[in-house]
From Swiss-Prot:
Gene3D superfamilies xref list: ATP synthase, E subunit, C-terminal
Superkingdom of this protein's organism: Archaea
Protein name: A-type ATP synthase subunit E
Membrane topology: Peripheral membrane protein
Keyword Transmembrane among UniProt keywords: no
Subcellular location: Cell membrane
Assembly: Has multiple subunits with at least A(3), B(3), C, D, E, F, H, I and proteolipid K(x).
InterPro entries tied to this protein: ATPase_E_C, ATPase_V1_Esu
């Protein structure tokens, strides 16, 4: 072989090596770019999935909050309806023996608590006559005055230092938690 052939063969080998390395470099570069595009797409997909999951959780949370609010409003409405029905029943019973006995027990309990028969009694204008009769029957002395209330009585010591509020409104207010519990039990027993 001649020097010329050796140079040509060396250049051919050099070109073949360059071609081989160029293909490997191009293939590696394309693979890296493809992996970068795939990774970026996977990141976008993960972000969209995460945002979708967060949105779903927010929608579920909002729905739960709204349903609890509606349940609370329904219970409040039921409670108010029940209280109004109690007031209506008191109005219907007014003057009956059962209601008169109820007022009598309230007066007796109040006088026992105050420990005096000299008292000031407040009653609904609709109950004043019955309360006057009961006060005489129980030997109570003092003033009987009218007060805007649904029923029951408010009894105070003569000097006003002790007040026993047995108005229907106060009795119901003291029983609201018990009434709520009963409503809850009635609703969930079914």
């Amino acid at each position: 072989m001649s020097l010329f052939e050796d140079l040509i063969n060396a250049k051919i080998k050099e070109l073949e090596d360059l071609k081989k390395n160029l293909l490997i470099d191009v293939e590696t570069k394309i693979r890296k770019e493809a992996e970068a595009v795939v990774n970026k797409s996977l990141e976008r997909i993960a972000t969209v999935e995460s945002e979708t999951l967060l949105e779903r959780e927010k929608i579920l949370y909002d729905a739960v909050v709204e349903s609890r609010k509606m349940i609370a409003e329904t219970y409040e409405s039921l409670l108010q309806d029940l209280i109004n029905s109690i007031y209506n029943e008191i109005e219907r019973m007014r003057g009956s023996e059962r209601y008169i006995n109820f007022l009598s027990r309230l007066l007796e309990n109040a006088v026992t608590y105050i420990q005096s028969k000299e008292v000031v009694i407040y009653a609904s204008p609709k109950d004043r006559g019955v309360v006057e009769t009961l006060a005489r029957k129980l030997g109570l002395s003092g003033l009987i005055a009218e007060r805007d209330m649904k029923g029951g009585v408010v009894v105070a010591s003569k000097d006003g230092s002790i007040v026993v509020d047995y108005s229907i409104e106060s009795i119901i207010a003291n029983k609201v938690e018990e009434i709520k519990h009963l409503l809850y039990e009635m609703t969930y027993e079914r």
